[in-house]
Structures are given as C-alpha cells and as structure tokens.
Amino acid sequence: MKLGTNCALLVVDIQQEDFQTMTVDNLGDPAWDCIRSARRVLDVFRARRLPVIHIQEAHRADHVDFGRELDGAEGLHCLEDSPGTDFAWLTYPLPGEYRVVKRRYSAFFGTDLEILLRGLHVDTLVLVGGLTDVCIHYTAADAHQ
C-alpha cells in the first residue's frame, strides 16, 4: 500500500454494539471480509507509525443529542457509559492513537477532528468502518469540503 507521509487513518464507528455479537450467520461473509480488511489497513498504518484516529459515536443517556437517527429504523444506540459504545476488540485504540467522539453521522460535525488533522498536517485521509452508507459516507463528504 503506497501512502504519503501526511496521511492519516480514520477508524469510524467500529464499536462493540455493532460487532460484539458478530458471527458468520448474522453478518455473513461480506461483513467479515470488511472487518478483516479494516484490520489489515490499521496494521499498515500502525507499522508505518502514521496517525490513526478512532471515531466513536456516543450519545447522552437522556437522548437530547440524537439527530436524524431516530427518524428511521435505527433506534437508540451508542449511549454513553454503555459497554456497547466501547471500541470493538479487533480495532481497539492503542496508546498514542487519537480518539474523537461524535454525536452525528459525520465525524467532522461538532467535533475537533478538523483541528486535529490540521495539527497533524494531514493532507490525505483513508477511512475504514462498518457503516459505509451512513457514517463513512458523511465523514468522507465533509472531509472533501
């Protein structure tokens, strides 16, 4: 994998709630492939000592900070202090890796992610995560702006 020196990895929403009950039966082979691929990319960034930023979705227990998620079929999820909100074991942050908590689909909305990326002089992002049609999509779109 060819990566520049100003590249960072965003590991988006790979959390216990989404993956703690993961089996081939309930996720299927494509999901396992996705998770294994995310780990391979993470291993490359770690080996090259490039910045890794873990994005964690977390909502207040009284639900005041939920957005459009509750308009659809998602329901309550990723509540602060819930074991399911913790990072998944497969991609758990190591010491020295960054963490950003978000409350919306995009990792940029209402967070300090842009400040962190500027401080690290990042000009290229690689994104991995489990929900590519929502959180990866919105984070990538906001990164492009």
Regions found by a protein language model. Give the residues of each.
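Acidic, glycine-rich active-site loops and adjacent beta-strand->loop/helix elements
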Residues: A58-H59, Y105, L131-V134
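Short, glycine-rich nucleotide/cofactor-binding loops
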Residues: N26-A31, V126-D133
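Active-site acidic carboxylates
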Residues: M1-P93, Y98
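Hydrophobic residues within alpha-helices
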Residues: A38-V41, L113, T139
